[in-house]
C-alpha cells in the first residue's frame, strides 16, 4: 500500500512516473501531483527542465542586443511637465551619446543646408508695407513627445523607420525653402481693401 502511493510535497518525480504520465496523457490532476507549487501549471517534458514560473521569477537574464538599446532617461526628461521646451537640448544629447549605434544610417536631422539655416534664422513678412522679423522657428511643445519617440525609433536602427524619417525631413526642408516665397506672396492688406470696396446691401439704394 505504501509503495503504491505517489510522493507528494516537494519530492521530485522519478523517471518512471514521468514516462507513465507521458504514456497515459497529460492531465491537470496528474500534473498537480508532480508540481511542487499548487496552483501553477506547466508541462513536464523529458530532457528539458521545467520553465521558471513568472509569478516567482520577475527578472530574467536575456541576451540584449546592443544595437537595439534605448537611450536612458536624462535630466531633460524631468522638465517636460513644467512648460520648458527641451527639444533642442534633448536631440543634441541623444545624437552625442548614441550616434555610434547607427553606422549605416543617415542623420538627416544634422544635414541643414545654407538655405534652410537662413530661412529658419529670420523670416520676413510683408504686412502693411513693413517687414517684421520673426524669431527662430522651434517645434511646438505638443510635438515634444512625438520627437522623442521618433528619435528612439531612429536609434533602433530599423531600416523602414530611417526611410520614413528621411522622407519626412526632406519634405520639411522643402516646405521651409518655399515658406518665404509663400508668405511674401500673401497680401492680407489687399484682400481687406477689396472687401471694403465691394458694395454691400446696406449701401444699395432702396427702390
From Swiss-Prot:
<protein>
    <recommendedName>
        <fullName>Protein I</fullName>
    </recommendedName>
</protein>
<dbReference type="InterPro" id="IPR004876">
    <property type="entry name" value="Corona_nucI"/>
</dbReference>
<dbReference type="GO" id="GO:0044423">
    <property type="term" value="C:virion component"/>
</dbReference>
<comment type="function">
    <text>Structural protein that is not essential for the viral replication either in tissue culture or in its natural host.</text>
</comment>
<keyword id="KW-0946">Virion</keyword>
<dbReference type="Pfam" id="PF03187">
    <property type="entry name" value="Corona_I"/>
</dbReference>
<dbReference type="InterPro" id="IPR044311">
    <property type="entry name" value="N2-like_embe-CoV"/>
</dbReference>
<comment type="similarity">
    <text>Belongs to the coronavirus I protein family.</text>
</comment>
Amino acid at each position: 500500500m505504501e509503495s503504491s502511493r505517489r510522493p507528494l510535497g516537494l519530492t521530485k518525480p522519478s523517471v518512471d512516473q514521468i514516462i507513465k504520465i507521458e504514456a497515459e496523457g497529460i492531465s491537470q490532476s496528474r500534473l498537480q501531483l508532480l508540481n511542487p507549487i499548487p496552483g501553477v501549471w506547466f508541462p513536464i517534458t523529458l530532457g528539458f527542465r521545467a520553465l521558471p514560473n513568472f509569478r516567482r521569477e520577475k527578472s530574467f537574464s536575456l541576451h540584449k542586443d546592443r544595437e537595439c538599446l534605448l537611450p536612458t532617461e536624462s535630466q531633460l526628461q524631468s522638465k517636460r511637465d513644467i512648460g520648458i521646451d527641451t527639444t533642442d537640448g534633448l536631440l543634441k544629447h541623444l545624437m552625442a551619446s548614441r550616434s555610434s549605434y547607427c553606422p549605416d544610417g543617415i542623420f538627416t536631422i544634422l544635414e541643414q543646408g545654407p538655405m534652410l539655416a537662413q530661412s529658419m534664422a529670420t523670416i520676413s513678412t510683408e504686412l502693411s508695407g513693413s517687414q517684421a522679423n520673426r524669431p527662430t522657428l522651434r517645434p511646438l511643445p505638443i510635438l515634444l513627445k512625438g520627437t522623442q519617440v521618433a528619435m528612439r525609433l531612429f536609434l533602433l536602427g530599423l531600416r523602414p523607420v530611417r526611410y520614413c524619417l528621411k522622407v519626412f525631413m526632406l519634405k520639411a526642408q522643402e516646405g521651409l525653402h518655399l515658406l518665404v516665397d509663400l508668405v511674401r506672396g500673401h497680401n492680407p492688406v489687399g484682400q481687406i481693401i477689396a472687401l471694403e470696396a465691394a458694395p454691400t446691401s446696406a449701401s444699395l439704394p432702396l427702390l
